[in-house]
UniProtKB/Swiss-Prot annotation:
<dbReference type="GO" id="GO:0003746">
    <property type="term" value="F:translation elongation factor activity"/>
</dbReference>
<keyword id="KW-0251">Elongation factor</keyword>
<protein>
    <recommendedName>
        <fullName>Elongation factor Ts</fullName>
    </recommendedName>
</protein>
<keyword id="KW-0963">Cytoplasm</keyword>
<dbReference type="InterPro" id="IPR014039">
    <property type="entry name" value="Transl_elong_EFTs/EF1B_dimer"/>
</dbReference>
<comment type="function">
    <text>Associates with the EF-Tu.GDP complex and induces the exchange of GDP to GTP. It remains bound to the aminoacyl-tRNA.EF-Tu.GTP complex up to the GTP hydrolysis stage on the ribosome.</text>
</comment>
<dbReference type="Pfam" id="PF00889">
    <property type="entry name" value="EF_TS"/>
</dbReference>
<dbReference type="InterPro" id="IPR036402">
    <property type="entry name" value="EF-Ts_dimer_sf"/>
</dbReference>
<dbReference type="InterPro" id="IPR018101">
    <property type="entry name" value="Transl_elong_Ts_CS"/>
</dbReference>
<dbReference type="InterPro" id="IPR001816">
    <property type="entry name" value="Transl_elong_EFTs/EF1B"/>
</dbReference>
<comment type="similarity">
    <text>Belongs to the EF-Ts family.</text>
</comment>
<dbReference type="GO" id="GO:0005737">
    <property type="term" value="C:cytoplasm"/>
</dbReference>
<feature type="region of interest" description="Involved in Mg(2+) ion dislocation from EF-Tu">
    <location>
        <begin position="80"/>
        <end position="83"/>
    </location>
</feature>
<keyword id="KW-0648">Protein biosynthesis</keyword>
<dbReference type="InterPro" id="IPR009060">
    <property type="entry name" value="UBA-like_sf"/>
</dbReference>
Length: 307
């Protein structure tokens, strides 16, 4: 049996972050070979990580990364907010967002991509992090937006570090106009999106099933009225609904006397040409995952915007 020294155990702990007894066992199992012990611990850690996958990961961070006319948004979940404040976790999320810039805009392609500064993939690096920290984590979703001319504006709410927070937004503005002006306008619209959480750009982007559900509610509320009256009520009710949930029709949070569409039209003079809001993406941390009620981040943004 190899002579396992305290210095060897310390070295292995520094390399892996594993516990002292685990490091000692690894060295005994590998006859004191440090690199083999690292692999032994990784295998053991990964086995433990697989067991943790059943636990709900609803905390974590969203991250944005921008390259001017191209930007990415990712959400990585953890089980606790404590881990979200961990430097190693934050570094992983930040790097994942950078890698996402050159991904196909889906989780599978990002997981398979090379993780910078390593000889492994993004997926494997996350598994290593799970083994080291001891908490389940998931790369939940990723999105990218790009324009041939114009800007992709970004905004992060609840920011814990540069580009990392609780709500992340990307806004694509297509225009040949002044980039500095477009960047400012785009950020304002991104803040608006964070606060109001629109379902789509305009009515054409609303799921037909959602429209039918709203129509059914209006018909039920006004049951018994003549058909021609009911039709007008439904039409009017849907128009009001669209103003609430479609980005272009919403009152602009920075100036509620105007809609976002009107703001874009007025911006053309300052931009020096037409400005088209082509797309947006909004991720709110943990949305759709069952968990205990947390802070209403959208309300926080709305309050911040209104001063």
């Amino acid at each position: 049996m190899a002579n396992i020294t305290a210095a060897m155990v310390k070295d292995l702990r520094e390399k892996t972050g594993a516990g002292m007894m685990d490091c000692k066992s690894a060295l005994n199992e590998t006859a004191g070979d440090i690199e083999a012990a690292v692999d032994w611990l990784r295998k053991k850690g990964l086995a433990k990580a697989a067991k943790k996958a059943g636990r709900v990961a609803a905390e974590g961070l969203v991250a944005v990364e921008s390259a001017g006319r191209h930007a990415a948004l990712v959400e990585v979940n953890s089980e606790t907010d404590f881990v979200a404040r961990n430097d190693g976790f934050q570094a992983f999320v930040r790097e994942a967002a950078k890698v996402a810039l050159n991904s196909q805009g889906n989780v599978e392609s990002l997981e398979a991509a090379h993780f910078p500064g390593s000889q492994t993939t993004v997926k494997d690096r996350l598994q290593e992090l799970i083994a080291t920290i001891g908490e389940n984590m998931t790369l939940r979703r990723v999105a990218t937006l790009a324009v041939s001319q114009g800007v992709i504006a970004t905004y992060v709410h609840g920011q814990v570090s540069e580009g990392l927070g609780k709500i992340g937004v990307l806004v694509a503005l297509e225009s040949a106009g002044n980039v500095e002006f477009l960047s400012t306008l785009g950020r304002q619209i991104a803040m608006h999106v964070a606060a109001t959480n629109p379902l789509a750009l305009d009515a054409s982007g609303i799921d037909p099933a959602t429209v039918e559900r709203e129509s059914a509610i209006l018909r039920e509320k006004n049951a018994g009225k003549p058909d021609h009256v009911l039709a007008k009520i439904v039409e009017s009710g849907l128009k009001s609904y669209y103003k609430e949930v479609t980005l272009l029709d919403q009152p602009f949070v920075h100036d509620t006397s105007k809609t976002v569409s009107q703001v874009l039209k007025e911006a053309e003079g300052k931009a020096g040409g037409p400005v088209k809001l082509a797309a947006f993406v909004r991720y709110a941390l943990g949305e759709g995952i069952e968990k205990e009620e947390g802070p209403d981040f959208a309300s926080e943004v709305a309050a911040a915007v209104k001063g």
